[in-house]
Amino acid sequence: MQPFDQPVIALRKKILELHDMAETQGLDFKEELNLLEERLRRLELDIYGNMKAWNRVQLARHPERPTTLDYVRLICDDFIELHGDRHGYDDAAIVGGIAMLNGQAVTVIGHQRGKDTKENIRRNFGMPHPEGYRKALRLMQQAVKFNRPIITFIDTKGAYPGRAAEERGQSEAIAKNLFEMAGMPVPIISIVIGEGGSGGALGIGVCDQLLMLENSTYSVISPEGAAALLWKDASLAEKAAESMQITAPDLLRLGIADGIISEVIGGAHLDVSLQADKLKSVLEQKLAQLTRLTPEQLIEKRTEKYHQIGT
């Protein structure tokens, strides 16, 4: 299946080829390039300005979409990754550690996908085992001990559903994280940067502020899974995506998300540095607001936030 924005991709490629030809052959294509770039701007507005839910799902899953580590390395200084759950395991599908954000020490945790087949296998395609959630909880408890704000990056299809993961307590690990995060006396900000899939996302997603990138999704099940359950046909995923209300605008309207971070036109993968700047700006603003609250106020407001969802 071709991407929905294939005409834009093809035109961008043509413009780059013309730029290269002008440089290598010393030819003047200024007029032609101006026309093509104007045509590209109109095409981008037409396609990206009228996206449906399934189009956003495609962008959220883009193989070049920035990951947790991409953002952490761009928005934070002195990041030190910490490993292991202290029970003999280190799940590479969840990364975390301590870093400095504008001079303030923070704990950062997030799902981590791979950029190629080899890394995806090592990171289990960003689907954590229970040990990943236990590692995340260990880092969050450490953040509480040292009074550090917690920032989590959500980007997973879901917790790994394999038999071994279930035998080692997948449900218990996620449930314990939900319980513990609800009462942590430090600011917690969660950002959905790609896919937010079911309990696998919630396992690091109980927070004071839930932010979503413009083209991210957050849902109890994938569109393919919903289509298979509802209509016994996973190929109806596009239809399911439209009815599930899983996009950032949907979730903001429903009171689940607390804010949307705008994306670079065409998706975050097209300019990772600019996207990181956008994310950092909003993150700093939200962090400044939350750090002014007392621990008691944080827990009270967090509890109220979740009580209001669905009412």
Swiss-Prot record:
Q: Name one Pfam family in it.
A: ACCA
Q: Give me the reactions it catalyses.
A: N(6)-carboxybiotinyl-L-lysyl-[protein] + acetyl-CoA = N(6)-biotinyl-L-lysyl-[protein] + malonyl-CoA
Query: Is NADP tagged as a keyword?
Result: no
- What GO terms describe the biological role, i.e. biological process, of this protein? fatty acid biosynthetic process; malonyl-CoA biosynthetic process
Q: Per its database record, what is this protein's job?
A: Component of the acetyl coenzyme A carboxylase (ACC) complex. First, biotin carboxylase catalyzes the carboxylation of biotin on its carrier protein (BCCP) and then the CO(2) group is transferred by the carboxyltransferase to acetyl-CoA to form malonyl-CoA.
Q: Does the keyword Lipoprotein apply?
A: no
Pathway as given in its UniProt record: Lipid metabolism; malonyl-CoA biosynthesis; malonyl-CoA from acetyl-CoA: step 1/1
UniProt cross-references to HAMAP family, sorted A to Z: AcetylCoA_CT_alpha (MF_00823)
UniProt record similarity statement: Belongs to the AccA family.
* Domain of life, source organism: Bacteria
* UniProt KW keywords: ATP-binding, Cytoplasm, Fatty acid biosynthesis, Fatty acid metabolism, Lipid biosynthesis, Lipid metabolism, Nucleotide-binding, Transferase
The protein's name is Acetyl-coenzyme A carboxylase carboxyl transferase subunit alpha
> In the record, what lineage is assigned to the organism producing the protein?
Bacteria, Bacillati, Bacillota, Bacilli, Bacillales
Organism of origin is Exiguobacterium sibiricum (strain DSM 17290 / CCUG 55495 / CIP 109462 / JCM 13490 / 255-15)
Which residues fall in a coiled-coil region?
none
